[in-house]
Curated annotation (Swiss-Prot):
Basic and acidic residues bias (residue ranges): 162-181, 218-236, 256-312
Sequence ranges of Polar residues compositional bias: 182-197, 204-213, 447-461
An annotated GO cellular component: nucleolus
Compositional bias ranges of the Acidic residues kind: 486-495
Matching PANTHER family: PROTEIN SPT2 HOMOLOG, YEAST SPT2-RELATED
Disulfide topology: none
Protein name: Protein SPT2 homolog
Length: 581
């Protein structure tokens, strides 16, 4: 086969391939759109057509009947009501036929409305004045061009592009320098290149700054990050760590090892804490109550200590030589001569003095139930004047504390009256002075009689003191009075109750003793709260129960009514039978 035959054979094959291209089997790479299926209009059957015609005829008949009914009603309307309606239509000019006709003929029927269709408002009514205003406004607005709210974005010039390039380059160089600075430790010399870069950045910024600055969010973000880093560096520089001791050398370590080698190694075994049982609501409340009581107790102790430090020791006021009771607010009297106290006073065994002692003792009993403020009243002051022959001499000039308070009383005389011990007046050592010395005492130094003779004369035959204020016999039990409730009593602290509750850690395991004695181990029981879940109910359950109870009540009422009716019926029957007989 020569070359010419070969070419002919190749051409023949190529022609055969080109002929079979349309018929050959292959996967097409081009996707043709889906063919639209044209729906053929289906011919309705004759029965359906008849049914539709019948339905249309029925609807037309229905409309005709409605129209006829309306006409009949309008015909039945009297002339008076028709006139009213016409007048109303003239006033409102709405749905008036004449107006609608004008609207049809109006030349300016615009916006594609058909003739007879209402244009605007009021059902087709057109005002000539309104149309004139509208035309005037349209002519004015027609020439006004639309003002766009935003200016069109101007195309970036070559200058702006160069600026952005420079900015990106500066940001990349800054990031590289920061990365290098973070890897190696920053020294004092490293501040120089950073300042150089800053100056470089500023020069770059000046080079690309245009007449109109463009907002760049990326540059703003980078600036914020840079500021944050600077603040962080400044904060770290401020925090100075304390100088640590130099590390131990090898010789020091060997010496320490020689010292420690003979010491026994102590391993501290940590105590395993057993998981505690969770508290119930009641136990939690009790625990909170105990903690609150402990806090209050601690506060009271602190207050008491501070009061003890602040209040100065009260100096007991001694009696004046003439026997007069010193006033609390009076200035301190001048120092009397020391021998003036040694002058005795004559005892007054009169009836009036005895009565005054009984009055003072009753006053002292009544003042014991009052507060420390009321103890400074004159009623209690008179109690210290009176003589008590059975009192001991050791009580002279010693103020006793009122109740269990450690705070010293301001008035020592009131304190002695509260205790019940009244110091003797005159003292025992002075009562032994001879009668010869008593005669020498001047009249001015003698104590005044209480109550005075002129007061006794004015009282006449009246009993003094009254019967209810008389002194009780010593063997009689004290009268129990109802104590007035005072809020201050709650804050009072009783020292006897200090040891009642032991809040300290107890070394003994009390629960183990209880376990041995009673054979009770609380670990075997679950800590279940005693609250009854069945007692709690939701709103729906309450409503359901109310509905059931209401239903039952109604049934019971109906049953009672039925029973009453039956009872009445039976009574009537009995009455009828009795009347017949």
């Amino acid at each position: 086969m020569d070359f010419g035959d070969l070419l002919r054979y190749a051409k023949k094959n190529s022609d055969a391939v080109t002929k079979e291209v349309g018929q050959g089997k292959y996967y097409s790479t081009k996707y043709s759109p889906p063919k639209k299926q044209s729906k053929e209009s289906k011919q309705l059957s004759s029965n359906i057509q008849k049914f539709l015609q019948k339905k249309e005829a029925e609807e037309a008949e229905k409309k005709r009947l409605e129209r006829q009914k309306l006409n009949d009603l309008l015909a039945k309307r009297d002339e008076k009501s028709k006139n009213k309606i016409r007048k109303m239509l003239k006033v409102t000019k709405s749905a008036n036929k004449s107006v609608l006709e004008d609207a049809k003929d109006y030349e300016g029927a615009i916006d594609g409305h058909e003739a007879g269709e209402g244009q605007g408002d009021d059902y087709g009514y057109v005002s000539t004045e309104a149309n004139a205003f509208y035309d005037k406004y349209i002519e004015k607005v027609r020439d006004v061009q639309e003002d766009k709210g935003f200016t069109p974005s101007r195309p970036q010039s070559l200058k702006d592009l160069s600026g952005t390039k420079e900015r990106v380059k500066a940001a990349i160089t800054r990031e590289r320098e920061e990365a290098k600075g973070n890897t190696r430790q920053k020294s004092s010399t490293s501040t120089l290149p950073s300042s150089a870069t800053k100056s470089k950045e500023s020069s770059v910024a000046r080079s690309y700054s245009t007449s109109k600055t463009l907002y760049d969010p990326n540059a703003e973000k980078l600036e914020e990050e840079r500021k944050k880093r600077q603040e962080e560096e400044q904060r770290r520089a401020k925090i100075k760590r304390p100088a640590q001791p130099p590390p131990m050398d090898f010789q020091a370590l060997l010496r320490l090892a020689e010292k420690k080698q003979h010491e026994p190694v102590v391993f501290e075994v940590e105590k395993k804490k057993e998981p505690e049982r969770l508290l119930s609501a009641r136990e939690k409340r009790e625990l909170e109550e105990r903690q609150r009581q402990q806090e209050q107790r601690a506060q009271r102790l602190k207050m008491r200590e501070s009061e003890g430090k602040e209040t100065p020791k009260s100096i007991p006021n001694r009696m004046e030589p003439n026997g007069r009771i010193p006033k609390l607010n009076q200035a301190k009297p001048a120092n009397a001569p020391s021998d003036s106290f040694k002058k005795p006073t004559a005892p007054q065994p009169t009836k009036s003095s005895a009565s005054s002692t009984s009055l003072s003792s009753s006053n002292s009993h009544s003042s014991a139930s009052r507060s420390s403020v009321s103890s400074s009243r004159p009623a209690t002051k008179s109690a210290q004047l009176t003589a008590r022959p059975g009192a001991t001499a050791s009580a002279v000039g010693k103020p006793s504390s009122s109740s269990s308070r450690d705070v010293p009383s301001k008035n020592p005389y009131a304190a002695t009256s509260l205790k019940g011990t009244v110091r003797e007046f005159p003292p025992r050592d002075q009562s032994s002075i001879s009668t010869l010395d008593r005669r020498k005492i001047p009249a001015a130094a003698k104590t005044r009689q209480t109550p005075s003779s002129d007061v006794q004369r004015s009282q006449g035959g009246r009993q003094f003191p009254p019967a209810d204020v008389k002194r009780r016999k010593p063997n009689e039990p004290p009268v129990t009075k109802r104590r007035i409730y005072d809020d201050d009593d709650e804050d009072e602290y009783d020292s006897e109750l200090d040891d009642f509750i032991d809040d300290g850690d107890c070394e003994e395991d009390i629960s183990s003793h209880i376990r041995d004695i009673f054979g009770y181990d609380k670990r075997r029981y679950q800590g279940i709260d005693d609250d009854d879940r069945g007692m709690e109910s939701s709103f729906a359950q309450v409503q359901r129960e109310e509905f059931i109870s209401k239903k039952l009540g109604m049934q019971e009422d109906l049953e009672d009514m039925r029973m009453e009716a039956a009872h009445k019926k039976q009574k009537k029957l009995v009455a009828k039978i009795s009347s017949r007989s």
